[in-house]
């Protein structure tokens, strides 16, 4: 639009210059009596007036460019992968081919755009092949509450969530067992008595001697009964 206005202003000035040269020639040759000079004078004045007024015409600013100025770039970060962990959850909503790059540009918006009216967006563009480098350009500020975890959400790379400040509740933590030494001692004693009673009640005398020859023999050497209630007669 501004180039079009400048071209018209130049054309008007050139027209005025031509009229001024014609007027100069008439005055030089003293031909003003036979030819009217008023049209030339009016053309010169009109051309200068148009050229001066064209500079005061307001420039048209496109809505697209004004929107870009309002939503300024907040920052840029480079990463080796398109799934850059920056502490926010993003959702991909589009991609397109860029004239100045062989790689497509990916567009993301905050995952809380609808729930919390967050207008933050970002663009991901591959700027280098070997080694790969992806540039993340952030536009707008987050109006949502920043989550306590980071998210990978790079299109086909899937979505993986990592929560760094997660504390395991005490209810699911393994609890140490309380150990009562007296209780264990009583259980051991009860177990020993149970074994002895089992031997006295269910084993034959010969089998008991064959199974425990050393124990029975040792007790017999000291004049003790092998087991209370168990009579062993070896021939």
Curated annotation (Swiss-Prot):
Main location class: nucleus
Gene3D superfamilies, alphabetized: WRKY domain
Compartment(s) where it occurs, according to its Swiss-Prot or TrEMBL record: Nucleus
Signal sequence extent: none
GO terms, molecular function: DNA-binding transcription factor activity; sequence-specific DNA binding
Domain of life: Eukaryota
Keywords: DNA-binding, Nucleus, Transcription, Transcription regulation
Pfam families in the cross-refs: WRKY (PF03106)
InterPro entries linked: WRKY_dom (IPR003657), WRKY_dom_sf (IPR036576), WRKY_plant (IPR044810)
DNA-binding region, residues: 79-147
Cellular compartments per GO CC: nucleus
Protein's job: Transcription factor. Interacts specifically with the W box (5'-(T)TGAC[CT]-3'), a frequently occurring elicitor-responsive cis-acting element.
Family listed: Belongs to the WRKY group III family.
Cited PANTHER family: WRKY TRANSCRIPTION FACTOR 21-RELATED
Protein name: Probable WRKY transcription factor 66
């Amino acid at each position: 639009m501004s180039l079009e206005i400048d071209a018209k202003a130049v054309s008007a000035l050139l027209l005025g210059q031509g009229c001024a040269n014609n007027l100069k020639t008439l005055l030089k040759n003293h031909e003003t009596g036979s030819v009217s000079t008023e049209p030339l004078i009016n053309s010169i004045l009109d051309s200068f007036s148009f050229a001066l007024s064209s500079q005061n015409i307001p420039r048209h600013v496109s809505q697209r460019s004004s929107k870009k100025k309002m939503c300024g770039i907040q920052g840029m970060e480079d990463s080796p992968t398109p799934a850059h962990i920056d502490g926010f959850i993003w959702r991909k909503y589009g991609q397109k081919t860029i004239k100045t790059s062989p790689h497509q540009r990916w567009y993301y918006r905050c995952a809380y755009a609808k729930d919390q009216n967050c207008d933050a967006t970002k663009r991901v563009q591959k700027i280098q092949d070997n080694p790969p480098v992806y540039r993340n350009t952030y536009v707008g500020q987050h109006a949502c509450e920043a989550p306590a975890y980071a998210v990978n959400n790079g299109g086909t790379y899937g979505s993986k969530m990592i929560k760094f400040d997660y504390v395991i509740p005490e209810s699911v933590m393994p609890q140490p067992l309380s150990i009562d030494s007296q209780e264990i001692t009583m259980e051991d004693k009860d177990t020993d008595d149970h074994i002895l009673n089992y031997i006295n009640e269910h084993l034959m005398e010969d089998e008991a001697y064959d199974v425990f020859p050393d124990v029975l023999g040792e007790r017999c050497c000291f004049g003790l009964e092998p087991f209370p209630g168990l009579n062993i007669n070896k021939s």
